[in-house]
């Protein structure tokens, strides 16, 4: 419903009432933007309950928290100008509603399949492969590879905007890359793979997107170049750059990487929603 700009709030509330199996749903949702804000509240609730138990000061929390403060405190006129600049790279609203919300709903609908992988988040073990493997099978290789590939594409679309926001936050200008070889126009001309590679020059983004933008998994799924060893629970991917080389990742590590990717998508969605809601209201 949120994909339709002319959607009636009454239709949204009825849909939500049916989804939650209740007679009536929240009143006071009178506009399309109210409904988007409400859906974002549901995302925030899911995020709060599913995020890893890591301190806000950790490398995994710094960027998200700083961007939320940045979006909350910026002068509204300046924020509106920034939004117009960002929309050159991808529509914030379209990404939020059509890409992020849809992907989040899909993963939430089967989140129990990822519960074992979340253990690594609880123990703050973010580096893959993990030395202590769980050897549990709550999701198969085909499904987790497909989920990871889908999440990769969701992040891929919003990546230029996250880069621009980090530039603005850290250095005061969307074109001020940590590696001064780039501007946003130059970054946009890069292939997706080269954009991901360029992130390695930025310590903040490199750490933030750790595990979320693995080209080997994505290419293995996209080009049907992956194999599964059920005996050892290992996913094997043909290296796109070196076809004679196989990349091995334990199944539960792929699930953990997909879970972290999912967390990142929720965080970016909350930042984008904060920007849009301040401008809309």
Enumerate the predicted regions with their spans:
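Flexible secondary-structure boundary motifs
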Residues: 145-212, 220
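Histidine-centered, metal-coordinating catalytic motifs and their short helical/loop contexts
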Residues: 206-235
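Extended intrinsically disordered or low-complexity regions, especially N/C-terminal cytosolic tails and loops
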Residues: 1-141, 212-213
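Amphipathic alpha-helical surface "interface" segments used
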Residues: 11-17, 186-191, 281
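Short, hydrophobic/amphipathic alpha-helical patches that form generic packing surfaces
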Residues: 41, 45, 142-167, 257-267, ...
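Amphipathic alpha-helical scaffolding segments
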Residues: 124, 165-169, 238
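Amphipathic, Lys/Arg-enriched alpha-helical patches that create a basic surface
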Residues: 235-281
